[in-house]
Structures are given as C-alpha cells and as structure tokens.
Amino acid sequence: MARMPSAERRRQLTEAAIRAMARDGVAKTTTRSIAAEAGVSLSVFHYCFDSKQALIEAVITTLTDHSVTVVKEALRPRDTLEETVAAGFRAYWDHVRAHPEAHMLTYELTQYALREPGFEHLARRQYELYGEAYAELIEQLRRDMDLELRVPVSVLARYLAAMTDGLTLNYLVLGDAAAWADILDTVTAHIAGLVR
C-alpha cells in the first residue's frame, strides 16, 4: 500500500464509507467493511478517524459538498432569474436521479444521528450545512445578478433547504420523475417571487 497524505487518505476512506453505507445501510456498516471497501488495513482507518462521530461528520460534509458542487457549477447568471434558478434546481435534480442511493443515505444519516446517543449534534450540523450552502448560493446570485430579496438571506436559505429536502424525499418515496418539470416550474416561479 502506497503512503498517502492523511487528508487524502481521509477522503479515500470517506468515499469508501459513503459507498458502503449507501449499499449496506449506516447501522450495518462497520469500520472493517469501510477499510475493506477502501482497500486499507483497519489500523489505517483508526489512524485517520478517531471516532465514528468523526467519520459520520466527514460523510455528511462530503455528501453535502457533492450536491453543492453540482449546483454551483450550473448556477451562473442567465438572461432571467427564472432561467438561473431553474438551471440550479435542474442540476440538483439530475444529481438526485443519478445518485438516489446517496440522497437516501443523507436521510438515513439524519435518523441515525438523531437516535444514537451522543450523535444528535451531527444531525444539527447536517442541516446547518444545508443552510450555509444555500446562503452562499443566494449571496452569490444576489451579487452576480444585483438582486434585492424580499426576505433575509438566512430565512430564504432555510426555506430552500427545507423545500429541497421535502421534494427530494418525495421523489425518493414516489419515484415520479415525470412530475419534476411541473414542480420545477412551480418552485422557480415561487423563488422569483421572493426577489424584487
């Protein structure tokens, strides 16, 4: 096994944990199965992560980063605010449809953290990350498109996180991809209405 900087090894183990957890479930994923998935010894795993909490926090952060990166790449100013917002949501939705197992894992991680004593703060952190990501995207759009919001950024960010969360869960449960176009139009029109 080649030596690798610890930050890179942590990323490797985090991605392996995401694959193992998405496949086997959070509760059934062990440190051994993650090490095997990454192709490293168990001692390497324990060198990189001193607790299961640290691993789960890394998984939550990485999953959030995956989704945010997809949206950021798509969210560049277009001719209208509606087109810009629609492009961001479309990119996110394409990610959900392409990686449903990763998005299911986010809900499983939330439930696991809420039920596991001492892990509750990780569920809170997960949703704080969602709000922070939306606030950053909103601020970027506000600057780039010279927008004036009708509500504070923090309120809009939390609202968008809750709405996206609900839409994602609805899709994962019902699997109605055909309905997305109408939903996207409704969401886009509503968001545009929150801007002057």
What role is predicted for each listed range?
Residues R9-Q12, R19-A58:
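Helix-turn-helix
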Residues V68, A98-M104, P117-R143, D185:
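Amphipathic alpha-helical packing segments from all-alpha helical-bundle domains
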Residues F49, E108-R115:
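Short helix-capping/turn signature of helix-turn-helix
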Residues G118-R124, L141-V195:
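Hydrophobic/aromatic-rich alpha-helical bundle segments in the mid-to-C-terminal region
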Residues T61-S67:
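Short, basic, alpha-helical segments at the C-terminal edge of helix-turn-helix-like DNA-binding modules
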Residues A16-R23, V70-A74, L105, L109, ...:
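Solvent-exposed, amphipathic alpha-helical segments
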